Amino acid sequence: MEKYVSFMTCADFIVSTPDYFRYNPADEFITPEQIEEIAANTKSSLSGTGYAVRKPVYLWMTEDALRQDYARYESAEQLDSHMSRMEHRGDMVMGDTRIEALDNSLFDKLQVFDGDISPMLEPNNNAIAIAVSLDDYGNLPNPEYYPKVGDTITATYADDVKYIDSRTGELRTEDTPEEYFQEKLYGARDVEYTVCALVELPYSMSYRYGGIGYETVLSVDTAQRDSGGAAIPMLYLFDTADDADEAEAEQYLSKLTAGEFSPLMYESKATARSEFAQFRQMFLLIGGILCAIIGLVGLLNFFNAMMTGILSRRREFAVLQAVGMTNRQLKTMLIYEGLFYAMSSVAVAFILSLAVGPLAGKMLGSMFWFFEYQFTVLPVLLTIPVFLLLGLLIPCMMYDNAAKCSVVEQLRDAQ
């Protein structure tokens, strides 16, 4: 469960507005006053704010990298046309970017894939971290897409952006064909950053949507300095020291966000655990039904095999009784035989569990990243008393039914 919870949320509590959690663009999210109120009414061991840079900003990246982004949405012909309209500097192209600024306390939430984030904690730094997309198993599928640690990259901040008609230099109109659209930046200025690290930015504290270009991380002081104070609070997150503080915070936030028109929403590890419990319950229900069906079929087959074995040997049993075997001896023999079949079935089930269990666990682990296989003999142990009981009762019932007839009648029926 904790593997699932840690993936779904990186903190005990994340608070913002409904627009943030519903992926709606907004000019304002959670306010500093709301953050202060929450901080004053909760006990936290770690807390901080994530900021969105609400200003046009672009990052200069290689054309090959930008082509990888657009190739997901455009044909080769459209892509070539698009690239020809974009602003170039040598082999670099001006691409979109998403810059998120973090309080220094939140850098502990980043998973460093390569490099070191400590330069971002220094005052007046020009360090930037590139957020990479790792797969469910922590691997970087396309390392060539990202800049290298130590590279210098240029970001262009602008006060405003307009689309113009590249033929006339005037603002575009409704009649302007798309192939002549061109961005024009007003009040643009460049800032050079040094890539200090490639990091995984947890989804739960990111913008929560993708796009074209790199997603980057700056310290809040650097972002405010370079954007002219355009970094606004986007989310507030905090961890609690113990379960009691977590329960108190959960109760407080549930009251604070109650109501359909509440200006705030929150996510917590408690909600993630509840989601996992429902997900797990679905697997238990479906798996339990399938196991019950398979188990019932297995028991019926076991019952049928034993019953058929006894009925097919009625003549043999009658002959044994005719030559002197007592009813008690015959019944005891059948019981031991039934118990032998029962324990043989359990032994085969145990061997199959040892052989098939790890293979099935590996297969499920490749399908569900949060799945961890753990071998258990409990299901096999639970079948032992059931099979022993069947191995004891079936011979007794079948023999008692046959013993109602004399040996002569049994021989005649067997013929």
List the predicted regions and their residue ranges:
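Hydrophobic alpha-helical transmembrane segments
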Residues: 230-231, 238-240, 288-293, 323-337
